[in-house]
UniProtKB/Swiss-Prot annotation:
Pathway(s): Amino-acid degradation; L-histidine degradation into L-glutamate; N-formimidoyl-L-glutamate from L-histidine: step 1/3
Classification via PROSITE patterns: PAL_HISTIDASE
PTM (free text): Contains an active site 4-methylidene-imidazol-5-one (MIO), which is formed autocatalytically by cyclization and dehydration of residues Ser-Ser-Gly.
Transmembrane segments: none
Record's catalysed reaction(s): L-histidine = trans-urocanate + NH4(+)
UniProt-listed InterPro entries: Aromatic_Lyase, Fumarase/histidase_N, HutH, L-Aspartase-like, Phe/His_NH3-lyase_AS
5-imidazolinone (Ser-Gly) cross-link site: S144-G146
Protein name, as recorded: Histidine ammonia-lyase 2
Annotated keywords: Cytoplasm, Histidine metabolism, Lyase
PANTHER family in alphabetical order: HISTIDINE AMMONIA-LYASE
First-tier enzyme category under EC: lyase
EC number: 4.3.1.3
Amino acid sequence: MQKIIEINGSNLTIEDVVAVARYGAKVKLDEKQKDKILESRKYVEEALSNKMPIYGINTGFGKFENVPISEEELELLQKNLIYSDACGVGEAFDTEIVRAMMILRANAISKGFSGVMIETVECLLNMLNAGVHPIVRSKGSVGSSGDLCPLAHMVLPMIGEGEAEYKGEILSGKEAMKKAGVSTITLKAKEGLALINGTQAMMGNAVLAVYDAEKLLKQADIVASLSIDALGGIIDAFDERIHLIRPHKGQIYSAENLRKLLKGSKRTTRQGEKRMQDAYSLRCTPQVHGASRLAFDYVKQTVETEINSVTDNPLIFPGENGACISGGNFHGQPIAIAMDTLGILMSEIANISERRIEKLVNPALSHGLPAFLVKNGGINDGFMIPQYVAAALVSENKVLAHPASVDSIPTSANQEDHVSMGTIGARKARTIVDHAQHVVSIELLCAAQAADFWDSKNLGVGTKEAYRTLREKVDFMENDVIFYPLMDKSFEIIKSAILLANVEKIIGLLK
């Protein structure tokens, strides 16, 4: 029986979000949160009855903050906010991103500081459970005040507007909700603002990118070890003593992984046996992979914190000394910097992987392997062009790794005079992770092919399992074949993290 993810604004994890977004896990609201949601809603209604002026509830938005809104127009104000802000451009986000946005926004407003109705939280959860996925255009957010534009597209079907995907068909929002049996809602005072003034579009991208990146970091060690094994690499460079006197945690862990993976190899060598030192792409694998791991720890911690944060404005603090306070929790800068960091650290994983690919295919560098890892070179091109593909991907990553978070263009007539560009950063980071997965999967193909030119039986205990995992899907390439299906199969092994799962079954958990 599939686990049901219960949301309460405090305990949602990266794995929970992925379970809902990618694998369709069901969701429900923690019953204990209902009183907190009701309490914050009660504060809003009492403030309105007392004619208290509150930003975005009975005033305009942004530069219109000082324009009062009459009681009769409060619901119209919220509807107009969604209408006007739903102006995104570009391709629609993938369904898994939209689902991540939905669960993350529901989680944030369920915490009890947003002043929404319980029915509003449950509408998002019911849509997730029924498979109603708003069509959310991917471009148009500057990352402060939150992700207004994409989240407005997310809200449209909730009020019977916009478009949504349901059972593979693009329908009007109203029709999708009706077919799925999910009731639409009427936005009450503050609710439109509470739904769109948050960081959940950048976070939808961020959570999935972080999840995939974490799997890739360990698999990069696995694939690198197979390349090192196939090339007869010098294992002295991974000696524990070297890494303990430069005690960066990521470097120590990566070196430990390599030793564990290469244990029992009859292909690896010792310094001085055949050569004194290996090229940096082999010898410095722990230092490069380790630096990315260390930076990743910061990225993951930031994203984990944001998952259970309240990021709208103004915020309701109900109770005896209740207050509604305007602040800046919608500002995406924490995620913007983290996503730029993720893009950079993943670019480096791909960069060094591509250099190992070059070492495997280049006969001047491969210590006895045939040119481009193929018999009868000339009539066969072998693995020549996959290296081009890897080079193209790492080159594109270098452009994408330019930080978005250092840019800011003022908006709303300079009222919102510093913005994060965090959603741009998160979209870029997700693309870079995808590219890095492809590059590492190309290295896996090359390393396994290289191993077969010697004797795969001589591989280490971990590298042998990595080799076997690929060979279950992809055979040794005797002569040129249509290549992209092989690359697709190798990519799926990396994307699904089956490589990691299989290797860890044999040698135990990697660091």
